[in-house]
Amino acid sequence: MMSSDPPSLRFGQVVIGPPGSGKTTYCRGMQEFLSRLGRKVVIVNLDPANEGLPYPCAVDIAELVTLDDVMDGLKLGPNGGLIYSMEYLEANLDWLENKLKLHHDCYFLFDCPGQVELYTHHNSVKNIFAQLSKWNFRLTAVHLVDSHYCADPAKFISVLCTSLSTMLHVELPHVNVLSKMDLIEQYGKLAFNLDFYTEVLDLSYLVEHLSADPFFRNFNHLNVKLAEVIQDYSLVSFVPLNVQDKESMMQVLRTVDKANGYCFGDLEERNLQAMMSAAVGADFQFSTTLGVQEKYLDATKNHVEDEVMDL
């Protein structure tokens, strides 16, 4: 039986995103970063496919169910096995509650599976997050996306659609993160300045750039409508991140703390100046993005918008 008496307020992040986006690396980096700031951090691994974890794990779903056991026992593939594992966890939430009760006055990082369908179409993960909220967790969904997708307009529109769908389905305060900023131009230069992608500015320019490709020109009407849906909701924006960069990590942390209310919570002493700074957004997002662009983008290459201005 799950307790009807919820514990005191607890804060944390649920780290989601497609496979290979850097969720586990982010959890390890954020744990080290928060520990240096004096926060007591607990990592909860909710990914049954995670093996050889690079961080100390306080709660591990592998004690309850593993993907290999599910695939072998039920003859399921990787996707079906992950869905079954999440349904099994949902049916055994008392196990998770008892594990979490052992950790008091901690900040929680939940390392989640990478299957996109779990956050856009299936309800088990959504229900697990909802139950965590009932247990007095104040969580922010940190959705990691590979930054190099910005170099491909078609992939970036797909990323925007996935991010929007996830935000609407998961129903948590949401921070979208462009991860691996040090590799952003690995597969080609960006067509626009970085703030165009982080703030998701006028997508009609991106659609025009996409229609220059003969293949995608055939799908121009579809791309226009997808861009309209994204901009009509006006929900998606991104925070750039390089886990090795302390300033970048601090920017993400500030955004997350505002989203879940940690900066106004009672887990540690916060002075009035820090709270007011968070409330008015005194970290100036534009200046931060400009600094990231200067650090990671090749300044010798002209962007499309620069070339247009030169005409």
From Swiss-Prot:
GO molecular function: GTP binding; GTPase activity
Motif mapping: Gly-Pro-Asn (GPN)-loop: 77-79
The keyword Hydrolase is assigned to this record: yes
Residues bound to GTP: 20-25, 179-182
UniProt-annotated site: Stabilizes the phosphate intermediate, residues: 79
UniProt-listed InterPro entries: Gpn, Gpn2, P-loop_NTPase
Pfam families tied to this protein: ATP_bind_1
Domain of life: Eukaryota
Keyword presence, GTP-binding: yes
Keywords: GTP-binding, Hydrolase, Nucleotide-binding
Assembly behavior: Heterodimers with gpn1 or gpn3. Binds to RNA polymerase II (RNAPII).
Similarity comment: family membership: Belongs to the GPN-loop GTPase family.
Task of the protein: Small GTPase required for proper localization of RNA polymerase II and III (RNAPII and RNAPIII). May act at an RNAP assembly step prior to nuclear import.
Protein name: GPN-loop GTPase 2
Species for this entry: Danio rerio (Zebrafish)
Gene encoding the protein: gpn2
